[in-house]
C-alpha cells in the first residue's frame, strides 16, 4: 500500500506543478522525451513505477472479482497511432503551428492536438492506433467505453476522427 500512495502523491504533485509552473511543464516534456527514447536512468525508473501501478490495479481487479482478456498499453500504439495521424493529414487532420490537430468544429465537436510540435502523439493520437488494434484482435460488432463525464468530450473527438478514417468505427 506504500507504493500506490507514493505514486498517487507524486501524480498529484506533478499534475499541480505542470498546471502552475512553466518550468515544471518543460521538465515533464523532457522526461517524456527520455522515456520515449528509452534514455537511462529515466526509462528504468518509469518501468519500475509502471510495474507498481500495474500490481496495484491487479489487486483491485482481484478484489472486485473481474478480469480482462487483454491489456493494451500506450507503448504498443505510440508509433501506429502517430503514423495513422500522419497518413491522414489533409484528410482528417491538419497542421497548425507545428502540431497536427483535428479541427472538430466542422463536425460539431472541438479541436484537439493529436501530434505535438515535438512530434509526439498525444493520448488522442495514440487512440488512433488503439481502435484498429482492438478491432484486429477482437473483431467486435460494437465497443462500449464506460468513462466519466469529464472524458466524454475527449472521446467524442477521438471517435469522430476514427470514424472519418475508417467507417468500421462509425456509430
Across the structure, where does each feature detected by a protein language model lie?
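NTP-dependent nucleotidyl-transfer catalytic core
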Residues: 1-171
